[in-house]
Amino acid sequence: MASKKKERGPPPHSRSWQALTPPLSEWILDAVAAMGFTRMTPVQASTIPLFMGHKDVVVEAVTGSGKTMAFLIPVVEKLLRLEAPIKKHHVGAIIVSPTRELAEQIYKVLLSLLAFHAPSAAAIQPSTSDETADGETTLPSYPSSTLKVVPQLLLGGATTPAQDLSTFLKRSPNLFVSTPGRLLELLSSPHVHCPQTSFEVLVLDEADRLLDLGFKDDLQKTLARLPKQRRTGLFSATVSDAVDQIIRVGLRNPVKIAVKVKGAPGTEEKRTPASLQMTYLLTRPSHKIPAIRQILNSIDNTPQKTILYFSTCAAVDYWSHVLPSLLPEIFVTLPLHGKHPPNVRQKNFSRFTNSVSPSVLLTTDVAARGLDIPLVDLVIQFDPPTDPKAYLHRCGRAGRAGRRGLSVILLCPGREEDYIPFLEVRKTPVSLLESPPVALSDTLATEATSKIRETVLRDRALHDKAQKAFVSWVRSYTKHQSSSIFRITDIDWEEAGRAWGLLKLPKMPELQKFSGDRTLGVTLDWDKYSYKDKQREKHRQESLNSATTHNPLKRPAPSSSSNNDTAPWSKTLEKKSDKEKRRERKRAKKEREHWEKMTEEEKTKSRETHQMLEELRKKNRQELNAKSHTSSSVLSKPQEAELDGESEFEGFD
């Protein structure tokens, strides 16, 4: 018995790549060694054998734990261990990602892995690199019977569906890495085939977000086009929050793999990497910018990459214009949000990931999930996320692959402090920020507000952005899932306005009962406040002159009574007549619309009521006429005038 045990090789708990059963291909072992992965992470050691062994898997693991390689290796191995190559224009595997950036990241990791498989590298090379001017030879070609993996990246916005289909028909890839929308468009083509004989495996990365409302419909339609006899893997940091939805996806007896991080002895397990320090800082809204500046300045080693999270796209737009003057000069600021055109998103994301100088990425939750951005040392959350699940993913951009990281969330003193015990209940312990120390004062806050306003006063367009951003921030605040903690009634509007450097508070329903200073202490000649853009300023001036010329309220006048005295009486009468006609038309239209919406029973009752009213009016008129005959002719008209109102309905209850 002892000899048999020795023949089995390393114990099952070993995380050596050579210890896997079934064993990995030699070229994959070479690839992971060249990439610097000396041994598997816990999630890889648990997932790869099961996924390669024909099991559906639901994997819940902390962010930054190596989930990408945990599904890429089994997918590639499955496609390369088939009995025969996948037919032309047939798809063997699909990897679905919720965001463009994450899909691109997965695709790049896949290419770096396939570079070690010669047939696949030769098939991929013509589309990813061109021959040099000297006519250097490319990799050797292989017979069509050779098994290889040819991936295609599908992203909405970067190319059109027609271009993607053309690439598919030309190269005949057998593996898609895609976002949900573009994948569905391509699968809808009659030229793209996913039959049971060819299709092997489906991977849903960041599965809980893929099942959110925004992706649910596309995902269901996609699944309807795929064979049920397939292997499916769902990977996320918070799978447990979407279990009910995952069941409906159609996994067949899945194995659930949950990889947690153990804290110190006696403490509960955590859902974040041990190398990541998650902290909070209590600060008034107007102190947030000075706090961010101090953290960036006083942290031990200057963070190479920092991610600053805001709640809305409009907020990112606004702060990307005003923050550069507030942060230390060595930091480069870059905006990234979901409403950017695809080329802008790609450009800014690449600039941030490839930056050699300290950089700050201003973003929304579009950059909160799955992205493996190297050298992220610091994450600051200017606004808490509306969805508590996003908190964990935001923090997880730092402290990846064993690198030390710091996450700081800025909360206002008071009810928002309850967010900390709320996170602890969700197994996400957060401690008070002690290092680096942050010393705040009203003087620093006032200086920050003044600097923001100086920047905004240079261009009226920034004021417009500020108003839009503030309104969008308020809207997002009202939509917090933790509504008992984040309450709109607790906002100090003047304090919040100063924190954003507003020149005045915007007009919005939430401020209807606000009785404070809407100008925030700012005195400004709004007519002279101009746009930097000459065309916009020209248009504004024209609108201003037009309003002054045609709107009597804009013209200086001694009093409203004098204007009324000089206006012709006939025109006043005409205006009144026109006004009455408009009212009558509106009333008739409302009655007509109301009548069309009524049921037949309601219409019958309405007719009966109308008939009763007419009879009563007729009766009252007859009585009125009878009285008028007995009265003097002098009093008859005034009496009619008195009785043409309520008296018409006298006796009707």
From Swiss-Prot:
<comment type="function">
    <text>ATP-binding RNA helicase involved in the biogenesis of 60S ribosomal subunits. Binds 90S pre-ribosomal particles and dissociates from pre-60S ribosomal particles after processing of 27SB pre-rRNA. Required for the normal formation of 18S rRNA through the processing of pre-rRNAs at sites A0, A1 and A2, and the normal formation of 25S and 5.8S rRNAs through the processing of pre-rRNAs at sites C1 and C2.</text>
</comment>
<dbReference type="Pfam" id="PF13959">
    <property type="entry name" value="CTE_SPB4"/>
</dbReference>
<dbReference type="InterPro" id="IPR025313">
    <property type="entry name" value="SPB4-like_CTE"/>
</dbReference>
<feature type="compositionally biased region" description="Polar residues">
    <location>
        <begin position="558"/>
        <end position="569"/>
    </location>
</feature>
<dbReference type="InterPro" id="IPR027417">
    <property type="entry name" value="P-loop_NTPase"/>
</dbReference>
<dbReference type="InterPro" id="IPR011545">
    <property type="entry name" value="DEAD/DEAH_box_helicase_dom"/>
</dbReference>
<keyword id="KW-0378">Hydrolase</keyword>
<dbReference type="GO" id="GO:0005730">
    <property type="term" value="C:nucleolus"/>
</dbReference>
<keyword id="KW-0539">Nucleus</keyword>
<dbReference type="InterPro" id="IPR014014">
    <property type="entry name" value="RNA_helicase_DEAD_Q_motif"/>
</dbReference>
<dbReference type="GO" id="GO:0003724">
    <property type="term" value="F:RNA helicase activity"/>
</dbReference>
<feature type="short sequence motif" description="Q motif">
    <location>
        <begin position="17"/>
        <end position="45"/>
    </location>
</feature>
<dbReference type="GO" id="GO:0005524">
    <property type="term" value="F:ATP binding"/>
</dbReference>
<dbReference type="InterPro" id="IPR001650">
    <property type="entry name" value="Helicase_C-like"/>
</dbReference>
<keyword id="KW-0694">RNA-binding</keyword>
<keyword id="KW-0698">rRNA processing</keyword>
<feature type="compositionally biased region" description="Basic and acidic residues">
    <location>
        <begin position="590"/>
        <end position="626"/>
    </location>
</feature>
<feature type="domain" description="Helicase C-terminal">
    <location>
        <begin position="291"/>
        <end position="444"/>
    </location>
</feature>
<keyword id="KW-0347">Helicase</keyword>
<protein>
    <recommendedName>
        <fullName>ATP-dependent rRNA helicase SPB4</fullName>
        <ecNumber>3.6.4.13</ecNumber>
    </recommendedName>
</protein>
<dbReference type="GO" id="GO:0016887">
    <property type="term" value="F:ATP hydrolysis activity"/>
</dbReference>
<feature type="compositionally biased region" description="Basic and acidic residues">
    <location>
        <begin position="572"/>
        <end position="581"/>
    </location>
</feature>
<feature type="short sequence motif" description="DEAD box">
    <location>
        <begin position="205"/>
        <end position="208"/>
    </location>
</feature>
<comment type="similarity">
    <text>Belongs to the DEAD box helicase family. DDX55/SPB4 subfamily.</text>
</comment>
<comment type="subunit">
    <text>Component of pre-60S ribosomal complexes.</text>
</comment>
<feature type="compositionally biased region" description="Polar residues">
    <location>
        <begin position="627"/>
        <end position="636"/>
    </location>
</feature>
<feature type="compositionally biased region" description="Acidic residues">
    <location>
        <begin position="641"/>
        <end position="653"/>
    </location>
</feature>
<keyword id="KW-0547">Nucleotide-binding</keyword>
<keyword id="KW-0067">ATP-binding</keyword>
<feature type="domain" description="Helicase ATP-binding">
    <location>
        <begin position="48"/>
        <end position="257"/>
    </location>
</feature>
<dbReference type="Pfam" id="PF23681">
    <property type="entry name" value="CTT_SPB4"/>
</dbReference>
<dbReference type="InterPro" id="IPR000629">
    <property type="entry name" value="RNA-helicase_DEAD-box_CS"/>
</dbReference>
<feature type="region of interest" description="Disordered">
    <location>
        <begin position="534"/>
        <end position="653"/>
    </location>
</feature>
<dbReference type="InterPro" id="IPR014001">
    <property type="entry name" value="Helicase_ATP-bd"/>
</dbReference>
<dbReference type="Pfam" id="PF00270">
    <property type="entry name" value="DEAD"/>
</dbReference>
<dbReference type="GO" id="GO:0006364">
    <property type="term" value="P:rRNA processing"/>
</dbReference>
<dbReference type="InterPro" id="IPR056330">
    <property type="entry name" value="CTT_SPB4"/>
</dbReference>
<keyword id="KW-0175">Coiled coil</keyword>
<dbReference type="Pfam" id="PF00271">
    <property type="entry name" value="Helicase_C"/>
</dbReference>
<feature type="coiled-coil region">
    <location>
        <begin position="571"/>
        <end position="627"/>
    </location>
</feature>
<dbReference type="GO" id="GO:0003723">
    <property type="term" value="F:RNA binding"/>
</dbReference>
<feature type="binding site">
    <location>
        <begin position="61"/>
        <end position="68"/>
    </location>
    <ligand>
        <name>ATP</name>
    </ligand>
</feature>
